[in-house]
Amino acid sequence: MSRDRFRSRGGGGGGFHRRGGGGGRGGLHDFRSPPPGMGLNQNRGPMGPGPGQSGPKPPIPPPPPHQQQQQPPPQQPPPQQPPPHQPPPHPQPHQQQQPPPPPQDSSKPVVAQGPGPAPGVGSAPPASSSAPPATPPTSGAPPGSGPGPTPTPPPAVTSAPPGAPPPTPPSSGVPTTPPQAGGPPPPPAAVPGPGPGPKQGPGPGGPKGGKMPGGPKPGGGPGLSTPGGHPKPPHRGGGEPRGGRQHHPPYHQQHHQGPPPGGPGGRSEEKISDSEGFKANLSLLRRPGEKTYTQRCRLFVGNLPADITEDEFKRLFAKYGEPGEVFINKGKGFGFIKLESRALAEIAKAELDDTPMRGRQLRVRFATHAAALSVRNLSPYVSNELLEEAFSQFGPIERAVVIVDDRGRSTGKGIVEFASKPAARKAFERCSEGVFLLTTTPRPVIVEPLEQLDDEDGLPEKLAQKNPMYQKERETPPRFAQHGTFEYEYSQRWKSLDEMEKQQREQVEKNMKDAKDKLESEMEDAYHEHQANLLRQDLMRRQEELRRMEELHNQEMQKRKEMQLRQEEERRRREEEMMIRQREMEEQMRRQREESYSRMGYMDPRERDMRMGGGGAMNMGDPYGSGGQKFPPLGGGGGIGYEANPGVPPATMSGSMMGSDMRTERFGQGGAGPVGGQGPRGMGPGTPAGYGRGREEYEGPNKKPRF
């Protein structure tokens, strides 16, 4: 009432933004009120100021709703209102059916409105009573009988029923007659199915027809439609009590309603748009990276009728997305269903719990996770990702989380939820039998089945067992025990027992903490000692390896030395063999020479004489001749000199001797005759080529002792 009284100007059965009433009753007239000829159920066209609107008039009390349409509008606006906004002077017919689009919530369906936008439930009121909205409120009438038609200002904010006639074209002459108060009231917007009149189609920005029941009342004028489809009751002169409010439907009822009134094409389009918008809203309920159709999205539905079918059970949850796994036990009256995300499951649980179905109240709860494990003794450095990675070797994981305190520090506990029971059983058995480590520290994790408790719904009164013990215990209401009474004494004993349990738990926790600290210190010392032993063993291993490598190196060097010695010995032996062979060859050559010399040295005198020349004439003048030797002359005859041979000319003899003395070669240049060859006797030009060969016998070693 406090904020809405600024919105209602004038009486009548109009909605929030009805300004101005009938002329006779004298309601507060707005400066943009329609002229006297305008009707209630007609859309507003271009209009101009009426001929009688000249000056302000005093406020008049609002008229009754049945006389609102018969009274002419007041001719003066309130004195506190500002001067009116002047519209363009020329008529523009296309502005009649093109009002601006109303503000709509993306999560709400469209509502039944007239050509003007209707504010939502949470829309802000006008700034003050002296400054009304800039949109001129009208009752939806054709252009009045002013001097000239004017274009329509921004559209009116009152609602029009779906069955209203279409807007009339602008005219500058005769005004149309308004409908009488005694005539039939406008049809309500809640009537399903196609309306009798043409569909109240919106303009380029106008909303569609209403979808929700509860349109404007027949006797109270058109009411303001809320986003849920319910009209706002008028505050003054309406057919509903002042300040009356209606209950808004829940979230899912706002999205799923019956077909809207109007043609079948409009209904199908609206149904498609609603389904698309609803699917988009469902997709927004899923968190980024959240897995779909998990065990956390599984709902338990109890107290089901015995004759329920699977299709009916699915239709019950169809508005919350496509259901996944469905199971129904008709004999015991319960079932399970798996939805897409946890948020959808929470919405379905909140809306369908305690819903009556064939005389039974449905009980909807989250199903217990049959494949969840509790993990304890976690290191402070284990995160959700590491926990999931570590346990993913046993099977697919739906969720793995490390429980933290209010400051975000790890409590050493975690929860791992598998997708199937065999994987959870395998992880439990493997971790119980073996030692499963997650970090470097030898701190094994302890795996146990998760104890699942319901801390959301608890135990409501309707689910408590009404047995005789329950009746006996509930006879006395809650109270504080009086001092000195029986219940006070035993209550104190109960409290002392609880205190003793608390102390013992604290002592056990303290002992366990000390034992853990001691084990950690021992483990740290043992770890350091173990590391030292490992280093020692590694050093010994390296030393042994080094010694072995040295031995191998020594052996290799010894082998190389032996090979070098063998090679040297072989080389020495080859050299000795070569030297021996050379000596043998030299000895053999020497023997051959000696043999040749010995054969020449032991020649008989006749053969030597034949080789050296006859008559002994060769020894004359020769240093190797008989004149220089101490042995007797070899040649025959007494005198072998030049004097003994007077027949030899001196020049020839001297030339022959000179030629033989000047030779540098051991043998002659001519053909060497045989050793025993016999040349011509005598000296002179007829001396053979091998003449000087006989001189070699004087150079041999066997001839040296003769000197």
Swiss-Prot record:
Modified residues (Phosphoserine): S8, S33, S273, S283, S374, S379, S496, S626
Biological classification of the source: Eukaryota, Metazoa, Chordata, Craniata, Vertebrata
Residues the record lists as N6-acetyllysine modifications: K208, K319, K338, K421, K472
Extent of the Sequence repeats: 9-11, 19-21, 25-27
Outcome of mutating L546A: Impairs DNA binding and ability to mediate transcriptional activation
SUPFAM superfamilies for this protein: RNA-binding domain, RBD
Identification of the protein by name: Splicing factor, proline- and glutamine-rich
Coiled-coil spans in chain: 497-596
Organism: Homo sapiens
Keyword Cytoplasm: yes
PTM-bearing positions, type Asymmetric dimethylarginine: R9
One Pfam family linked to the record: RRM_1
Membrane-crossing residue ranges in chain numbering: none
Region (Disordered) residue spans: 1-273, 579-707
Glycyl lysine isopeptide (Lys-Gly) (interchain with G-Cter in SUMO2) cross-link, renumbered residues: K271, K279, K338
Molecular function per GO: chromatin binding; DNA binding; histone deacetylase binding; protein homodimerization activity; RNA binding; transcription cis-regulatory region binding
UniProt-annotated location(s): Nucleus speckle; Nucleus matrix; Cytoplasm
Assembly notes: Heterodimer with NONO. Monomer and component of the SFPQ-NONO complex, which is probably a heterotetramer of two 52 kDa (NONO) and two 100 kDa (SFPQ) subunits. The coiled coil domain mediates interaction with NONO, and can also mediate formation of long, linear homooligomers (in vitro). SFPQ is a component of spliceosome and U5.4/6 snRNP complexes. Interacts with SNRPA/U1A. Component of a snRNP-free complex with SNRPA/U1A. Part of complex consisting of SFPQ, NONO and MATR3. Interacts with polypyrimidine tract-binding protein 1/PTB. Part of a complex consisting of SFPQ, NONO and NR5A1. (Microbial infection) Interacts with M.tuberculosis protein Rv3654c, which probably leads to the cleavage of PSF, diminishes the level of caspase-8 in macrophages and suppresses macrophage apoptosis by blocking the extrinsic pathway. Part of the HDP-RNP complex composed of at least HEXIM1, PRKDC, XRCC5, XRCC6, paraspeckle proteins (SFPQ, NONO, PSPC1, RBM14, and MATR3) and NEAT1 RNA.
Consequence when changing M549A: Impairs DNA binding and ability to mediate transcriptional activation
Protein keywords: Acetylation, Activator, Biological rhythms, Chromosomal rearrangement, Coiled coil, Cytoplasm, DNA damage, DNA recombination, DNA repair, DNA-binding, Immunity, Innate immunity, Isopeptide bond, Methylation, mRNA processing, mRNA splicing, Nucleus, Phosphoprotein, Repeat, Repressor, RNA-binding, Transcription, Transcription regulation, Ubl conjugation
Function: DNA- and RNA binding protein, involved in several nuclear processes. Essential pre-mRNA splicing factor required early in spliceosome formation and for splicing catalytic step II, probably as a heteromer with NONO. Binds to pre-mRNA in spliceosome C complex, and specifically binds to intronic polypyrimidine tracts. Involved in regulation of signal-induced alternative splicing.
GO biological process: activation of innate immune response; alternative mRNA splicing, via spliceosome; chromatin remodeling; chromosome organization; dendritic transport of messenger ribonucleoprotein complex; double-strand break repair via homologous recombination; innate immune response; mRNA processing
